[in-house]
From Swiss-Prot:
Keyword Transport: yes
Membrane topology: Multi-pass membrane protein
EC number per UniProt: 7.1.1.-
The species this protein was found in: Chaetosphaeridium globosum (Charophycean green alga)
One Gene Ontology term from the biological process aspect of the record: photosynthesis, light reaction
Recorded catalytic activity of this chain's protein: a plastoquinone + NADH + (n+1) H(+)(in) = a plastoquinol + NAD(+) + n H(+)(out); a plastoquinone + NADPH + (n+1) H(+)(in) = a plastoquinol + NADP(+) + n H(+)(out)
Protein name: NAD(P)H-quinone oxidoreductase subunit 3, chloroplastic
Database matches in InterPro entries: NAD(P)H_OxRDtase_bac/plastid, NADH_UbQ/plastoQ_OxRdtase_su3, NDAH_ubi_oxred_su3_sf
Length: 120
């Protein structure tokens, strides 16, 4: 039982972190008005009545750019803590970050050669 006592804080925050959003969504669902009118069913286009269909086919290029953006956006999220603790990590931390960046550069070169970054 002593082993589990050091995890009390973790379980407390995990339970609270699950209860608060659940209560927020449940309260919102219970208190939200449920009367639907024709005006509420239309899509909002800056105050202008929409013309045509809302469902259009996107070109795959948008998805490729979005995927490449997300990959490099996540890279910055991982590199920021590394940059903040660079002086404490030493040579091994630098080598690990260098390997991480090199893997991403290889992925970028691969995407570039496959034509994922070309718009034509």
């Amino acid at each position: 039982m002593i082993v589990f006592s050091k995890y009390k804080t973790f379980w407390f925050f995990l339970i609270i972190g699950a209860i608060i959003p659940t209560l927020a969504f449940t309260t919102s669902k219970l208190l939200a008005p449920t009367v639907t009118t024709p005006e509420k069913k239309t899509s909002y286009e800056s105050g202008i009545e929409p013309i045509g269909e809302a469902w259009i086919q996107f070109q795959i290029r948008y998805y490729m750019f979005a995927l490449v953006f997300v990959i490099f956006d996540v890279e910055t999220i991982f590199l920021y803590p590394w940059a903040m603790s660079f002086d404490q990590l030493g040579v091994y931390g630098f080598i690990e970050a260098l390997i991480f960046v090199l893997i991403l550069v290889i992925g970028l070169v691969y995407a570039w050669r496959k034509g994922a970054l070309e718009w034509s």
